[in-house]
Amino acid sequence: ACSAFLELHRLITQRSDELRKEELFYVLFSRLFGKYTHTSLQSRPLRSSQIKEACKYLESHASETITLDDICQRVSVSKSSLIRSFSKQLGLTPHGYLMSIRVKEAQTFLKQGIPPSLAALKSGFADQAHFSNVFNRLTGLTPGSYQNVFLKKAPSSNDSD
């Protein structure tokens, strides 16, 4: 809970993703509630069709600002149910899933020669630093390095002497 609280504090003091802030808030609240009341927040597990619907929503709105309320309203569930079931079924939080979608979109833009700063904006990242951090964490490369790998020209047959 301490590391989640510190991350939430960092996200609040910086301009960052609202979806991640909301997720951390609900995770912390659920943990604290369970610890200090000796009960846990019971949430109804989502059906796989609801998870698929949430995924489709995230995929089709990936470049937009998305909140937990948006997703929950779409699939008619509570925030705690969404986070818990999504994580259990996919191994990622809704935010983690959204970040993976955005990075895949950015990879497509980078392969097309679009500058990293523009690829970040077009794929839904609010700022270059956040984009670079997430991209590096998920791919192991910086956006510029990734682009260089894909934009290197293959040697032509005329170059071999």
Language-model segments: what does each one mean?
Residues 8-9, 106:
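Conserved small-residue packing positions in alpha-helical repeats and bundles
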Residues 10-75, 88-100:
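Short, Lys/Arg-enriched, Trp-marked, Pro/Gly-tolerant hinge/linker segments that flank
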Residues 56, 60, 64-69, 77, ...:
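Terminal helix-turn-helix DNA-binding modules in bacterial transcription factors
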Residues 94, 142-143:
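Proline-centered helix-kink/hinge sites
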